[in-house]
Regions:
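Core AdoMet radical
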Residues: 27-36, 50-64, 75-91, 101-125, ...
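Accessory C-terminal segments flanking Radical SAM cores
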Residues: 177-277
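Canonical Radical SAM [4Fe-4S] cluster-binding loop centered on the CxxxCxxC motif
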Residues: 2-38, 231
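Conserved C-terminal portion of the radical SAM core fold
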Residues: 54, 118-205
Length: 370
């Protein structure tokens, strides 16, 4: 499928019928009452003169009133994708019957195995996933590998494979036991993500100050119709039920954390792109590929403290303690107030057996001392 480069992420609702322990939304399974007119949304997108991919997300989109009608409306001229737990079986069946798979980029399906088991929904999940696959939809079943689930992931992956359902490990993003994930998987990541290096892209980079087309080619639509520049930048561009004023050109990113899709819209130098690749490889413990990318980045941006820090992380993983300390010292000397560099150097000097240095995500590092 030729997926449009213009993307709108519609956060339809924050309500969900699941209660996952690691979810950052409060559990709310009451009926959705705040709804938008899909015809108005479609008219806005049509008015740009460009095709769009509309990502339907939440919360749980399939509990949204009239969801199948909405999908039909949007797919007349645009492509959709859906983030779902695939638990509302009646709606899944209706979707499979009424919606053209050629107009659906994919269904990004969250397995949430512990919650699925709690509601006794494993068998229904298998039926729903197989129905969509057999109808020709692309179904990507993701498994959030919370640190407490690392050991059982392999077992669950093999179980669903027996039913013809491939499981993709998805890095947990957040804090667990004082460590920031996904960076904190360290070398453990190879066991889980070794066959899925693309999952290194699930990193919230710091693009602050870099030119970005978000607000023109990437939008976030809220449940009340408010349009933000992007998921990370809550600058209001208008309301889809009234008027929306899109940005022009590539205004700089204003946020230190890009939670979604930024890599498709930000403009990077060659060295910055190499730094990003190096981090992505490091997160999934593809350490040699990471080293090569970061060394190439450093050649293009000599003395970059973020790159030096990350090469130090890799040296530490290889057991090259002196080299790691040298790189951490160099990074900190260039940016003395950076808390991450301070913590890494202190940890390396302490030689604690459990020390695991942190990866730097500051792509525009020279502009951000902390």
């Amino acid at each position: 499928m030729n997926v449009p480069s213009n993307r709108m992420i519609w956060n339809m609702t924050r309500k969900c019928n699941f209660r996952c322990e690691y979810c950052y939304f409060p559990h709310d399974n009451t009926p959705v009452t705040e709804t938008l007119d899909a015809e108005r949304i479609s008219a806005f997108l049509n008015g740009t003169g460009k095709p769009w991919k509309v990502g339907l997300t939440g919360g749980e989109p399939f509990i949204y009133p009239g969801i199948i009608d909405i999908c039909e409306t949007l797919t007349r001229n645009h492509v959709i994708g859906i983030d779902t737990n695939l638990s509302v079986s009646s709606k899944v069946r209706e979707f499979a019957e009424r919606i053209d798979p050629a107009r659906v980029h994919n269904l990004y399906v969250a397995l949430h195995i512990e919650e699925r088991e709690r509601v006794k929904g494993v068998d229904a999940f298998i039926r729903n996933a197989r129905l969509l696959l057999d109808k020709g939809f692309e179904v990507i079943v993701n498994y959030v590998v919370h640190p407490t689930l690392e050991e059982r992931f392999i077992r669950d992956r093999d179980f669903f494979a027996e039913h013809g359902i491939a499981i993709t490990p998805r890095p947990f993003r957040g804090e667990h036991e004082g460590r920031r994930y996904p960076e904190a998987y360290g070398d453990r990541a190879d066991k889980v993500f070794g066959d899925h290096p693309e999952q290194g892209k699930k990193v919230a980079f710091n693009f602050q100050g870099l030119p970005c087309s978000a607000g023109r080619t990437l939008l976030r639509l809220e449940p009340d119709g408010t349009v933000f520049r992007c998921p990370g930048d809550k600058t209001v561009l208008g309301n889809v039920m009234d008027k929306v004023h899109l940005y022009e050109g590539f205004p700089p990113c204003t946020k230190k954390r890009c939670p979604c899709r930024g890599l498709d819209h930000v403009r990077l130098t060659y060295a910055q792109a190499d730094l990003v690749r190096g981090v992505q490889y490091a997160v999934v413990a593809a350490n040699e590929d990471s080293r090569l990318a970061l060394e190439q980045a450093l050649a293009g941006s000599p003395g970059n403290p973020c790159i030096e820090n990350n090469l130090g992380v890799l040296a530490w993983r290889r057991g090259e303690r002196d080299e790691a300390r040298r790189l951490f010292e160099s990074a900190l000397k260039r940016v003395p107030d950076n808390r991450l560099y301070v913590a890494n150097l202190d940890g390396a000097r302490s030689q604690r057996p459990d020390f695991d240095p942190q990866i730097c995500l500051d792509v525009n590092a020279s502009a951000h001392p902390d």
